């Protein structure tokens, strides 16, 4: 049997001609990533290894983004600790306040990940870079420490699931709706330790921002990684953001998949994930009358420029409902500046929304929009577990920027078509 995209990348980085699902391998790493929560633990473990330098100062990225700008003394101490480590080791890609952004939006923008890479990150949504045709996956801080020291990591080669995307999505349907539709279909463990491989002629109708959102949420189906075939849009994106050489891996015709799904994108509707699982989905025409207290538009899933443009399209000339707080968080400084230059901030502020500096912030219940007991939020983030954004008795509804913006105006979960 042949190999999938993921299996080919892993085989090449392990120096092997072929790998099979379940095989344990040791592969070379192109990037090791950590943030302000996971890196302090990794640094402590790194010290225990007994080495005095990292394997490559250019192949490590440290992004303080979760509690940044520092929300309290403890978070300030954490960032100080990893800042000093980055300086000591000469790590090139340490992104301070003013340069930093939400890590999984920042690394592709900076050209640090290209097709065919193997990337590990001490953050579960590291799978985002599969949008570029890379193998990327989340790991723990101990593996980050070992990766920084050796430039290698061990993997169990995953089985694969194939998602053949067909047709063209309709108005207001984005990558977020498509991945919520898929997770609703297969469940939060439907792709457990498998690679989700996205292909088909429908991929051409998805922007890179759509693909980043979909790969980002592969972990919400339990996947080891999500990965898209490289096409002209990918190549154009990489050309614009990176000067690195790269290799494109295509699946063999006889590659083996444990399951294959065909998704007609024209039939996918705007979709909302109800509490408390990303798989608890309903289409927008079946949500009922759910009043809300807060809307958050941002995160590593939906804080990119296209997301903000869609939100602005919905909010333009309208007002956020008097009972709703609307918080908009561009994912990086570059996106923030672009949104400002395009006049999107005027639209947001005139509508009554607040615009934040780039940060993960409320997504993980960190800061910049914590929920109180009994409050409901519509968020363009990726997780709606109990207590994820604040009080354990609050509720989170996951949606696209279009639905989130419309809900901010309506005061309840709803569609832009209702405005």
Curated annotation (Swiss-Prot):
Carries keyword Acetylation? no
Q: Which PROSITE patterns would you find in this protein's record?
A: ACONITASE_1, ACONITASE_2
Q: What is its EC number?
A: 4.2.1.33
Cofactor(s), by name: [4Fe-4S] cluster
Question: How and how many cofactors are bound, per the record note?
Answer: Binds 1 [4Fe-4S] cluster per subunit.
| Enzyme category, top tier | lyase
Q: Which GO terms describe its molecular function?
A: 3-isopropylmalate dehydratase activity; 4 iron, 4 sulfur cluster binding; metal ion binding
| Protein's pathway | Amino-acid biosynthesis; L-leucine biosynthesis; L-leucine from 3-methyl-2-oxobutanoate: step 2/4
Could you say which residues bind [4Fe-4S] cluster here? 300, 360, 363
**Catalytic activity, per the record?**
(2R,3S)-3-isopropylmalate = (2S)-2-isopropylmalate
Write down a Pfam family by its short name.
Aconitase
Q: Which keywords accompany this UniProt record?
A: 4Fe-4S, Amino-acid biosynthesis, Branched-chain amino acid biosynthesis, Iron, Iron-sulfur, Leucine biosynthesis, Lyase, Metal-binding
Q: Which family does it belong to?
A: Belongs to the aconitase/IPM isomerase family. LeuC type 2 subfamily.
Which protein is depicted? 3-isopropylmalate dehydratase large subunit
- Native source species: Acetivibrio thermocellus (strain ATCC 27405 / DSM 1237 / JCM 9322 / NBRC 103400 / NCIMB 10682 / NRRL B-4536 / VPI 7372)
Give the gene that encodes this protein. leuC
């Amino acid at each position: 049997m042949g190999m999938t995209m993921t299996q080919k990348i892993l085989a090449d980085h392990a120096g092997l001609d072929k790998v099979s699902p379940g095989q344990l391998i040791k592969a070379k790493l192109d990037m090791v990533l950590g943030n302000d929560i996971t890196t302090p633990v990794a640094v402590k473990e790194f010290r225990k290894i007994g080495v005095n330098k990292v394997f490559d100062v250019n192949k490590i990225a440290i992004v303080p983004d979760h509690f940044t700008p520092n929300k309290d003394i403890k978070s300030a101490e954490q960032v100080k600790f990893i800042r000093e480590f980055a300086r000591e080791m000469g790590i090139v890609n340490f992104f301070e306040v003013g340069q930093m952004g939400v890590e999984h939006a920042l690394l592709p923008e900076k050209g640090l990940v290209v097709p065919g890479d193997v990337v590990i990150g001490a953050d579960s949504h590291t799978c985002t870079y599969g949008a570029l045709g890379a193998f990327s996956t989340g790991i723990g801080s101990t593996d980050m420490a070992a990766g920084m020291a050796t430039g290698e990591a061990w993997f169990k080669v995953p089985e694969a699931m194939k998602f053949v995307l067909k047709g063209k999505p309709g108005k207001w349907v984005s990558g977020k709706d498509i991945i919520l539709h898929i997770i609703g279909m297969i469940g939060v463990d439907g792709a457990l330790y498998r690679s989700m491989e996205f292909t088909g002629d429908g991929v051409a109708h998805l922007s890179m921002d759509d693909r980043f959102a979909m790969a980002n949420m592969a972990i919400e189906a339990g996947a080891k990684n999500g990965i898209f075939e490289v096409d002209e849009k990918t190549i154009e994106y990489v050309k614009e953001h990176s000067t690195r050489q790269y290799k494109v891996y295509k699946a063999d015709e006889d590659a083996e998949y444990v399951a294959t799904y065909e998704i007609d994108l024209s039939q996918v509707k705007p979709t909302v994930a109800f509490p408390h699982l990303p798989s608890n989905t309903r289409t927008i025409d079946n949500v009922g009358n759910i009043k809300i207290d807060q809307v958050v538009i941002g995160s590593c899933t939906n804080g990119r420029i296209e997301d903000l443009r869609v939100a602005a399209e919905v909010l333009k000339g309208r007002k956020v409902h008097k009972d709703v707080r609307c918080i908009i968080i561009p994912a990086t400084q570059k996106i923030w500046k672009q949104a400002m230059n395009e006049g999107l901030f005027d639209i947001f502020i005139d509508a009554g929304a607040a615009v934040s500096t780039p940060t993960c912030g409320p997504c993980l219940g960190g800061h910049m929009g914590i929920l109180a007991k009994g409050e409901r939020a519509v968020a363009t983030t990726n997780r709606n577990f109990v207590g994820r954004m604040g009080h354990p008795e609050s509720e989170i509804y996951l949606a696209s920027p279009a639905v989130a913006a419309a809900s901010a105006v309506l005061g309840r979960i709803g569609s832009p078509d209702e405005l």
